Regions:
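Small-residue-rich helix-interface/hinge motifs
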Residues: 3-92, 311-330
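PDZ peptide-recognition modules
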Residues: 4-5, 80-113, 117-120, 124-273, ...
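Alpha-helical transmembrane segments of integral membrane proteins
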Residues: 6-9, 13, 300, 346-353
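Hydrophobic alpha-helical segments of integral membrane proteins
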Residues: 39, 60, 64, 115-119, ...
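Membrane interface segments of multi-pass transport proteins and intramembrane proteases
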Residues: 47-50, 148-152, 325-341
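Transmembrane alpha-helix interface/packing and boundary motifs in multi-pass membrane proteins
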Residues: 262-266, 302-316
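Small-residue-enriched transmembrane helix starts and helix-helix packing motifs
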Residues: 290-307
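Juxtamembrane boundary at the C-terminal end of a transmembrane helix
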Residues: 356-370
């Protein structure tokens, strides 16, 4: 039963995240007058298809993705779409449908329109993340966690080194705290159990350098930090819920960028990379705890996909936007041969990283270090 729940939850999350991403590309392409030849949910052989205003809407066998095939776009998706070179998908498109394909090819759209089309997928991932977090925060029984200290424990080291009841935590180690979890995340990253705080005290900003925290050791000899203070809860007014949801999107997005930066700086080990197997394992664990954990993981994954897709990497939407920025500045498109070579190399690198991350996942499963 647990395997079925994991499988169902994984399909739900991956399906929702990818479908909303592709819908973003689809909707903005339509708004910009670009011809959309196919909008597909799923991959592989066609199960159901219908036509409307020159666009084929398809449900395919494998619920592991989706795609949008745009006229004038050189991509595997366009090749799979009917009317391209995908010859195993059934009969040719009816002539009356082809006659309705009056939109312009993507490569003939204005540069700014192409940039909007490329960015729209990631934007919709952020929108989905916001909606999921909005529902999650609204439906939870607990109040919103604020950044204002309610009380500092007696003899707590953090109180002896600067923090006071009533302080509103603004930043930790120079990083602005949008939500309470920003503070906790930054404290987790510190290896010395001390940090520089910026707080708002009596209406003015106060710098508190070198705030230190108590520690304790478990039976395995591992050291843990004790926070030493509690914070106020916030009432769930509509404004507070909206602000917390928007700030939580920023929080999750920044975690992803910070993790990548830590990886490049050597602060995090490449052995910590996780791939599809690890994600499915995490989904299974979340599903065993309840819908709230699944929803929070859905929010994290969709925001993760949005952030990663905007990275200036040739195989990603962000890389395509960089090519378009170069075209906008110079007035000349980057030669297709150069774009193609960079994209192939980037895909090879990403595929290699995915294989390595999958290897890490399998090792963790076998050794029990999940």
């Amino acid at each position: 039963m647990s395997v079925f729940i994991t499988f169902a939850a994984a399909l739900l999350i991956f399906g929702a995240v990818i479908a909303i991403h592709e819908f973003g590309h689809f909707a903005v392409a339509k708004l910009c007058g670009v011809q959309v030849n196919e909008f597909s949910i799923g991959m592989g052989p066609t199960l159901i298809k219908t036509y409307r205003k020159g666009t084929q809407y398809t449900l395919r066998l494998l619920p592991v993705g989706g795609f949008v095939a745009l006229e004038g776009e050189e991509s595997p998706e366009s090749e799979q779409a009917e009317g391209g070179s995908g010859e195993d998908d059934g009969p040719d498109i009816p002539p009356e449908v082809l006659a309705q394909r009056t939109g312009k090819p993507l490569n003939e759209a204005a540069v700014w329109q192409r940039m909007l089309v490329m960015a729209a997928g990631a934007v919709m991932n952020f929108v989905l993340g916001f909606v999921v977090l909005l529902l999650l925060i609204s439906l939870r029984s607990e109040p919103i966690t604020s950044k204002v200290i309610y009380a500092v424990e007696d003899n707590a080291l953090c109180g002896q080194t600067g923090l006071q009841a009533g302080d509103e935590i603004v930043a930790v180690n120079g990083r602005h705290c949008f939500v309470a979890n920003d503070m906790l995340y930054e404290l987790m990253r510190t290896e010395s159990y001390r940090a520089d705080f910026t707080v708002r005290r009596d209406g003015r900003l106060v710098e508190l350098p070198d705030v230190r925290f108590d520690t304790w050791q478990d039976e395995q000899g591992q050291t843990h930090m004790t926070l030493g203070f509690t914070v106020y809860g916030l009432k769930k007014t509509p404004l507070n819920v909206l602000k917390e949801s928007a700030n939580s999107v920023i929080y999750y997005g920044r975690i992803i960028y910070t993790s990548l930066a830590d990886l490049l700086r050597g602060r995090e080990s490449i052995n910590d990379l996780s791939g599809p197997v690890g994600i499915v394992t995490a989904i299974g664990q979340a599903a065993s705890y309840g819908w709230e954990d699944v929803a929070e993981l859905l929010g994290l994954i969709t925001i993760n996909l949005g952030v990663l897709n905007l990275l200036p990497f040739p195989a990603l939407d962000g890389g395509k936007i960089v090519f378009l920025l170069i075209e906008a500045v110079t007035g000349h498109a980057v030669p297709e041969k150069i774009q193609g070579s960079l994209t192939v190399a980037a895909f090879a690198l990403l595929f290699g990283l995915m294989l390595f991350a999958t290897y890490n996942d399998i090792v963790r499963l076998v050794t029990g270090a999940v």
